[in-house]
Amino acid sequence: MSVLSKIMRAGEGKILRKLHRIADQVNSIEEDFVDLSDAELRALTDEYKQRYADGESLDDLLPEAFATVREAAKRVLGQRHYDVQMMGGAALHLGYVAEMKTGEGKTLVGTLPAYLNALSGDGVHLITVNDYLAERDSEMMGRVHKFLGLSVGCILANMTPAQRREQYGCDITYGTNNEFGFDYLRDNMAWSQDELVQRGHNFAVVDEVDSILVDEARTPLIISGPADQATKWYGDFAKLVTRLKKGEAGNTLKGIEETGDYEVDEKKRTVAIHESGVAKVEDWLGIDNLYESVNTPLVGYLNNAIKAKELFKKDKDYVVIDGEVMIVDEHTGRILAGRRYNEGMHQAIEAKEGVDIKDENQTLATITLQNFFRLYNKLSGMTGTAMTEAAEFHQIYKLGVVPIPTNKPMVRKDQSDLIYRTEVAKFDAVVDDIAEKHEKGQPILVGTTSVEKSEYLSQQLSKRGIQHEVLNAKQHDREATIVAQAGRKGAVTVATNMAGRGTDIKLGGNPDDLAEAELRQRGLDPEEHIEEWAAALPAALERAEKAVKAEFEEVKELGGLYVLGTERHESRRIDNQLRGRSGRQGDPGESRFYLSLGDDLMRLFKAQMVERVMSMANVPDDVPIENKMVTRAIASAQSQVETQNFETRKNVLKYDEVLNRQREVIYGERRRVLEGEDLQEQIHHFMDDTIDAYIEAETAEGFAEEWDLDRLWGAFKQLYPVKVTVDELEEAAGDRAGLTAEFISESIKDDIHEQYEQRETQLGSEIMRELERRVVLSVLDRKWREHLYEMDYLQEGIGLRAMAQKDPLVEYQREGFDMFTAMMDGIKEESVGYLFNLEVQVEQQVEEVPVEDEKPSLEKEDAVPAQAGARPEIRAKGLEAPQRPDRLHFSAPTVDGEGGIIEGDFSSDDDEEPVRSEADGLTRAERRKQSKGGRRRKK
């Protein structure tokens, strides 16, 4: 055990003793709750809420609340929480990550802290890895909460904002991490308070916390809209790279010349073009220099085309269905429907596959999962495998990890790895092993790392006449049903990675599923007939349990579930998760991994060394070796990948920390505007700051006689209808030499405030307040969006600062701060300019109509007096709401630390124009191309 691990686990015993004491307290009062009627049990919820309101803490209420939930679960679900589940629930309430092995009933554990923390009325979020689990858990565990009088909601991908608002209003809300994160971002793009759906971030329990906070934390959540980008280049470069040859890097010191037109580093997932490749590309495109600034975008297209050709494999990284490229999640093997890679990568893959190329996207709002979860006042989580990542949980989220003991001792046999020289020999051995175990009836779960390999294995099994189920990205609709029955006698299930995670594999089959199916056949619904369902469930469960009990004994005799891994994963944790499907609740079980030198992990790390060992030992292809050195090499490779990934995540967080502080300021400002805070005073500050900035820029150097006051007054005239003249000020000061910056500033400020009052008199104060709100929101959104674009651009090139002996992070922080300050100044200046110069038409309305429903009128009309209680409708050029593309995409974590992935498409009109600046009619991207010759892209 490393020194760090020992430090991390120092207080473990103390915490476990505390959790044991809590479980004992709950047990000591359990009898008091057994005798209560359903109505009396339900009435306790209101009593607890009142006691909390009267000043008792949730910790004081914990034993009674937990005992209440235990009794309710017994009556509604026919399940009683074990003592270890009580300990797990207490750990979650105290804000720890509870490590609970597979089959220990994590879902049921979640009901305890959820009920207790919901008593405060501030809402509890239970976060799962996919929509299926969120819906299943909210229905099943929701019965317990509803029985006790709490409301339960569930956020699903296809819900409308009104439905989402209703779900967030519930005491307890289930949903996926991406949905919660995107709702937070969407709330911070809302145009009116009525569009907001979330009500704060009080307490979150994250199920499969390692998957969400570790595996998926490398890539930020991104909401993006179409950018202005030519798509013809993708197709041209896709054809062009087929004519380029892959080669190896050269080494001038060793006198090795580079070969081919480009090189590929699979480990780092990067490509580099060689001189010969550059020459060919220049020749084919008819340009003199590929690296001239005007051709910079072409380098990005070329790199993406090579990556699409070499690093992204069909049926492993993505599948093509109905002419659409769909990404496959490396961790779960599921298809990520509607998601897309960022940075032009998806378009390059579409061009490679010859399907329609869709638009590229520009970031509108973004946050990393790490920073999103740090918004919660209290965070906790549960998983079967957390101790390997304890240092990361502590360092990034300040979360301690507590290993909760199992209810029964673990008796699974973990066999040592078998290593073969070739992949074909390995799969032959796998099929032989499956056939042998299948013949005696032992259930088998086979884990593969890609759709391609699961289908290859499926073909081999079919050739041998072995009946089996395949569970991969192409069949995830049926996954829960398949996984639930994977423990039946003679069952063979081939699953891609951790598909079906969250569903227990019970030996002999799952009685819960059978009982539920029987009750639904009788026309009962757990949502509609809560009382009848609760009454009928115990008998149905009893019948189902009898049916599977005999089969359970048979399977137990055969050795339990046999888990067979066909490849080691990059992370030890994912290997442990696969193993953990077997040996649940003290059942017997067995696991083994089969490896070959062709496996991705072996190929990228240490493969040559292992190859030498096998050659020296003269091992035939079909004979496995069990060698300690090879096992150590694998452990070392996994450790390297884990360290590399941890560093990536830490790095992402360091850079996002800069944006995070800026985001807090902007989103805080937005929320104040949305909530109707009076902006009049703030607008006056905007005016003063803008005037000061103008005057300082013109008068910072030289004497008064040298100042170009005509240019300064020209700027004032663009900002507002200035009435004070230079001559008047000179006269008041005696002469030009008597003018001071302070005197000019005071005079202009008095003038601008006076003109603003006149503008308000002309429009009416209520309309002016609404105009202020709209203008500030509109300008703030556009400036923030442009700032995100600039920050993206800055981060892409910041690594090069290291060559100048500068710390890229420090430079990013410094320049990011300068850009943020410039953006804030821009918001002030543009807001003031809009407020004076917008031509406004006002219509009175009783109900609020979205502003974007009609094009703004450019005619100025007389102000209509506002009726009490109704918000005036303002139409003005440049104030269409919202000022962002309607076609939005949602980019969620991917699996290799590459660019984000885009999910969802809330489209209205496909021919939306990019947002254009009032000043020159160009988008920011077009202006950048004019001034800098296009945006650079990272390799």
From Swiss-Prot:
Tell me the Pfam families matching this sequence: P-loop_SecA, SecA_DEAD, SecA_PP_bind, SecA_SW
Which residue ranges does UniProt annotate as crossing the membrane? Answer: none
Ranges of Basic residues composition bias in the record: 926-939
Keyword presence, Ribosomal protein: no
Q: Name one GO cellular component term.
A: plasma membrane
GO BP: any one term: intracellular protein transmembrane transport
* EC main group: translocase
Catalytic activity, per the record?
ATP + H2O + cellular proteinSide 1 = ADP + phosphate + cellular proteinSide 2
Source domain of life is: Bacteria
Q: Where in the cell is it found?
A: Cell membrane; Cytoplasm
Basic and acidic residues bias: start-end ranges = 852-863, 872-889, 914-925
Query: What's its membrane topology?
Result: Peripheral membrane protein
Extract the InterPro entries matched here.
Answer: Helicase_ATP-bd, Helicase_C-like, P-loop_NTPase, SecA, SecA_CS, SecA_DEAD, SecA_motor_DEAD, SecA_preprotein_X-link_dom
- Known EC number: 7.4.2.8
Per UniProt, the keywords (alphabetical) are: ATP-binding, Cell membrane, Cytoplasm, Membrane, Nucleotide-binding, Protein transport, Translocase, Translocation, Transport
Q: Where does ATP bind?
A: 85, 103-107, 504
**Annotated region described as Disordered, given as residue ranges:** 848-939
Function as written in the Swiss-Prot or TrEMBL entry: Part of the Sec protein translocase complex. Interacts with the SecYEG preprotein conducting channel. Has a central role in coupling the hydrolysis of ATP to the transfer of proteins into and across the cell membrane, serving as an ATP-driven molecular motor driving the stepwise translocation of polypeptide chains across the membrane.
Instruction: Give the protein family.
Output: Belongs to the SecA family.
Fill in the subunit field for this protein. Answer: Monomer and homodimer. Part of the essential Sec protein translocation apparatus which comprises SecA, SecYEG and auxiliary proteins SecDF. Other proteins may also be involved.
Q: What is this protein called?
A: Protein translocase subunit SecA 1
